[in-house]
Amino acid sequence: MVEQRELEPTPTKNRTIVERNSERELVVTRTFNAPARLVFEAWTRPELLKQWWVPKSMGMSLLSLDADVRTGGRYRLVFSHDASTMEFFGKYIEVTPHSRLVWSNEESGDNGSVTTVTFEETDGRTLLVMRELYPSKEALDAAGTGAADATVETFAQLDELLVTLGARR
């Protein structure tokens, strides 16, 4: 079962592709017009992550972000939406600078996913592949298309941030 959606490109002309590769795995790919070092920093430096991680259209705000970005380190994000809060937390399983991040998503207990993000640079551009592996089909179904749509929006926001960062560096 491969389900694929390709969304409209942003001003940089890059598309985000969302694929459900199996009953348990969701894969999101996008090329960014920035070196892997810069894209990786946007994922691992809290002051940068805060600028793009929250989908603007969803009316959410990021109340707090704690991240010890190293193998074995922990993270915790607290969001506010419609007068309620949501927490996301887990552990960094692998951190390989400028090439790979792997973390657990523990807020759902045994139904948590494992996220792997790879950064592959070619000619100053970075192919980012994000794989979310869920423990079951039901867990992935429960995440629904909302999570995929949010990721598409946040990747567009990341694209905008990288353009700004590239102009500053």
Give the residues covered by each predicted segment:
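Short, flexible helix/strand-to-coil boundary loops that buttress conserved ligand/catalytic motifs
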Residues: 43, 53, 79, 105-107, ...
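Beta-strand/loop substructures that line and gate deep hydrophobic ligand-binding cavities in soluble
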Residues: 3, 25, 102-153
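Short beta-edge strand/loop motif at the mouth of beta-sheet-based domains
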Residues: 27-28, 47-85, 169
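Short, highly charged C-terminal tails/helix-capping segments
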Residues: 162-169
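Hydrophobic/aromatic beta-strand elements that line small-molecule binding cavities or substrate pockets
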Residues: 30, 64-67, 88-94, 105, ...
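Hydrophobic ligand-binding cavity/cleft-lining segments
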Residues: 1-59
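Hydrophobic pocket/interface hotspot
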Residues: 39, 49, 75-77, 92, ...
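Short, conserved beta-turn/loop elements at beta-strand boundaries and strand-helix junctions
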Residues: 96-101
